[in-house]
Amino acid sequence: MAMMNNTEADVRTDTLIRVMALFFVAIIVLAVTTNPIPSGTGVGERAPPLEGKAYNGSAWTDFNMESYLTANWTAGDANGQWLLVEFMDTDCPFCVRSAGEMGQNANYFMKIDKDADGTPAWKGPVVNFVASATQLDIPGHETSRDEIEAFRDKSGEEECASSSCANRDGAAHRFVYIDDIDQDNMKEWK
């Protein structure tokens, strides 16, 4: 039995294989030579992700920093939202002393505080506050989620910097606290 040869089909197949090979080589060159979005804490870098469980005043839930970011944000966009991250420890004396001021700033920039006419006191973009509660290397100190809750809510019988968390400065906070007891987030942001 004689084999049938179709030279047109053979030429088309060879051409298709060559075009596909060039396409894949081009994709590989692009992948190797293109820089990804730089991640870090420097100017122009994308912030490292914050991960973990977060306490919002009622329950611990999964925290996703991406939900706070605007993907198509541009400089000067008055409608864009900002994200302010505070790394703190519930037993750090400075953190306890500045808790009142931090809460006031959060209420103002998150547009919770209102003017007499009911409009937000802050006229700029919304600034979302997030506290990443870590455990610093303070001798004789161990933190817990109960202590984080008591610090945020200004309640409970937990101790913050050797006194009751309920006695710290300011009112209860209205922003999210992330459990970073293991310091993973803090290390990413150094």
Identify the role of each PLM range.
Residues A47, A78-G80, G124:
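Extracytoplasmic
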Residues V96-G170, D180-E188:
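Structural microenvironment flanking redox-active thiols in thiol-disulfide oxidoreductases
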